[in-house]
Amino acid sequence: EDEVEETLPVAEEGREKSCITWRNSCVHNDKGCCFPWSCVCWSQTVSRNSSRKEKKCQCRLW
């Protein structure tokens, strides 16, 4: 029984890490985000010298 308790946090941590993934869109985010995480998108410039923007999305708890 003690062994099982020790391995649980590790499995949970791995699951959380796999949920925080980058994507180009939040459409159908249920396939890419794990509950209760939500998908957040924002625009950012590609580089300091460029005015071109790209959309970034990520799963987050906040």
From Swiss-Prot:
Using the UniProt record, give the first listed, main subcellular location: secreted
Q: What else is known?
A: According to the nomenclature proposed by King and colleagues (2008), 'Gsp(267)' comes from the species name 'Geolycosa sp (strain A267TDLS2-KZARNA)'. This species has been reclassified since that study, as indicated in the work of Oparin and colleagues (2016).
Task: Provide the disulphide bond pattern.
Answer: C19-C34, C26-C39, C33-C59, C41-C57
Protein name per the record: Omega-lycotoxin-Am1e
Domain comment text? The presence of a 'disulfide through disulfide knot' structurally defines this protein as a knottin.
User: Where does it live in the cell?
Assistant: Secreted
Q: Which organism is it from?
A: Alopecosa marikovskyi (Wolf spider)
Keywords per UniProt: Calcium channel impairing toxin, Disulfide bond, Ion channel impairing toxin, Knottin, Neurotoxin, Secreted, Toxin, Voltage-gated calcium channel impairing toxin
Instruction: Give residue ranges for the propeptide.
Output: 1-15
Q: Which family does it belong to?
A: Belongs to the neurotoxin omega-lctx family.
Gene Ontology, cellular component aspect: extracellular region
Q: Write down the superkingdom of origin.
A: Eukaryota
Q: A single GO molecular function, which one?
A: calcium channel regulator activity
Role description: Modulates Cav2.1/CACNA1A voltage-gated calcium channels (P/Q-type currents) in rat cerebellar Purkinje cells and hippocampal CA1-CA3 neurons. At saturating concentrations (>10 nM) decelerates activation kinetics and slightly increases peak amplitude without affecting deactivation kinetics. In vivo, does not cause death when intravenously injected into mice. In rat models, through its activity on Cav2.1/CACNA1A, has an ameliorative effect on memory defects provoked by hyperstimulation of N-methyl-D-aspartate receptors (NMDARs) in the hippocampus.
Question: Tissue expression, per UniProt?
Answer: Expressed by the venom gland.
